Amino acid sequence: MPGRADDDLKQFLARVALPPGWRVLHEPSVVSTNDIAREAARRGWPDRSVFVADYQTRGRGRHGRTWLCPPLAGLLMSVLLRRRDAPAYTYTMLAAVALSESIERLLALQPTIKWPNDVVVDGRKVAGVLAEASDDGREQTIVVGVGVNVNLDEAELAELPNATSLSIEAGVPVHRGELLALMLERFDSWLGGDRFTREEGLWRAWNGRLWGMDQRVRVQEGDDLLVATVLGGERDGTLLVRLDDGTVRRVIAGELLP
């Protein structure tokens, strides 16, 4: 894919100005950036530490699914947040909104958020986000993992028919560093202010980008496959849908199917 060889994250990070208080560690290859972030948390790394890799040998998504991406083709990162008292799903929302805003600003695309944790362009998955919380009795630590298909071509996504990449959708190679810098700027903005104002605004922004809103979709909930109309997301990250008989149902865990 043209553009990968020139996309040197380490050099970019050496000269870019990050928001105050943020620090980024870049590695060429890791098992998983989430694993690196969790270990860093145990070692006392500070709030707003970011771990980025050019390649992951065992990246994970929701339900332990493997996230594979060719070297230099994706933005693979984890954000360590400390002393956070909001539920983990708040930070899944935050990452999805921040990424969507960054893609829109950088490439003029119109990404939407597919419940519970995907970012899609024209209905095709371009990224996954997942926040995990841990509590040692003194503070809650959040690790937010983000995986973005940046410069993959159609052949590399052939076995994933509902996936796409930013370069495919934009029609040009995309610089991972520029996307990362925008994401951290948006992360920083959403983390500011008082908790109520932040979470209310975040919920509205997340709902405003929700894929399938007011449309009939298929919902996989455990062993049940529902056909329902999406009414919106709740502040706790659950999804409200209306069944064909008019019943409103709250989906706590599940997946929207194409």
Spans of model-derived segments:
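N-terminal lobe of the biotin/lipoate ligase/transferase fold
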Residues: 1-105, 127
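Long, positively charged amphipathic alpha-helical accessory segments at protein N-termini or as interdomain linkers
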Residues: 1-5, 9, 17, 84-111, ...
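Short loop/edge segments at beta-strand edges and connector loops
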Residues: 28, 113-115
